[in-house]
From Swiss-Prot:
Keywords, alphabetical: Biotin biosynthesis, Cytoplasm, Hydrolase, Serine esterase
Hydrolase listed as a keyword: yes
Name of protein: Pimeloyl-[acyl-carrier protein] methyl ester esterase
Top EC class of this enzyme: hydrolase
Record note on quaternary structure: Monomer.
Organism expressing this protein natively: Shewanella oneidensis (strain ATCC 700550 / JCM 31522 / CIP 106686 / LMG 19005 / NCIMB 14063 / MR-1)
Length: 263
């Protein structure tokens, strides 16, 4: 296992395991410690657990999504599979579009190409007032805002109370996110719309959804492009954090799909 962070290398990336390179990217308000429960099952891969800029142990990086992706690309191996949860899925999707030769497979978990609801297009997503509420609360009470967001992620799951506790315990093992990075992330969730660019993704693409997800409604999946290289898995009882609430079902979707990248 090794981890790196320095003045020249502001991203904290923890590398564990041996095998094909797999990059794993967390969502808003948390850090890569949320994936700790998956370490053992992913040990046949060389997994790079990334703290996004300003989250966990990574230093903030000013700029937009492209700036973040450039920093990731410069510090991660080429020819890797990229997996992203929630906001991390948006990051991984944009990276697969912008750097197709670097990314040989894409996995999005409870993620949308456009998180914001667009009423005029009947596009399902997060109501605008919810994100603006989080933005306002950030300035008042950072820890409470993070905790409230974790609660929303588990909402709908039968084990919501336990899920929230597990997420909170994992996330709080590292420093709270940088306030500016949280605002950057909210802006990305608010503004980015990749729907018209999805047809350029030619890599094998696994999309894992939670039917009870309160942030990425189940109605998003039928509106997504389909093709022979795309696999959709809808977990019937999962909410926004399926790898926490339904780890075995999540791994049953993920691990067989990953075997195509083994030599």
């Amino acid at each position: 296992m090794n981890a790196t962070t320095s003045a020249h290398h502001p991203l904290h990336i923890e590398t564990i395991g041996q095998g094909p390179d797999l990059v794993v990217i967390h969502g808003w308000g948390v850090n890569s410690a949320v994936f700790t429960p998956l370490h053992e099952q992913l040990s046949e891969y060389r997994v790079h657990y990334v703290d996004l800029p300003g989250f966990g142990l990574s230093q903030p990086i000013a700029g937009n999504l492209s700036t973040w992706i450039d920093a990731l690309i410069n510090n991660l191996p080429t020819n890797a599979i990229w997996a992203g949860w929630s906001l991390g899925g948006l990051v991984a999707t944009q990276a697969a579009i912008d750097y197709p030769s670097h990314i040989k497979g894409l996995i999005t978990i409870a993620s949308s190409p456009c998180f914001m609801a667009r009423e005029e297009e009947a596009w399902p997503g997060i109501p605008p007032q919810v994100l603006s509420m989080f933005g306002e609360q950030l300035g008042q009470n950072l820890p409470k805002t993070i905790e409230r967001f974790l609660a929303i992620q588990a909402m709908g799951s039968e084990t919501a109370k336990e899920d929230i506790k597990q997420l909170r315990d994992l996330v709080l093992a590292r420093p709270l996110p940088d306030a500016a990075a949280l605002t950057q992330g909210l802006d990305m969730l608010n503004q980015i719309d990749l729907r018209m660019q999805l047809s350029s993704i030619s890599q094998p693409w696994l999309r894992i959804w939670g039917r009870l997800d309160g942030l990425v409604p189940k109605r998003v999946q039928p509106q997504m492009p389909t093709a022979s290289h795309i696999t959709d898995v809808m977990l019937a009882k999962a909410s926004h954090a399926p790898f926490v609430s339904h780890r075995q079902e999540f791994l049953q979707a993920l691990l067989p799909w990953l075997t195509q990248f083994k030599d």
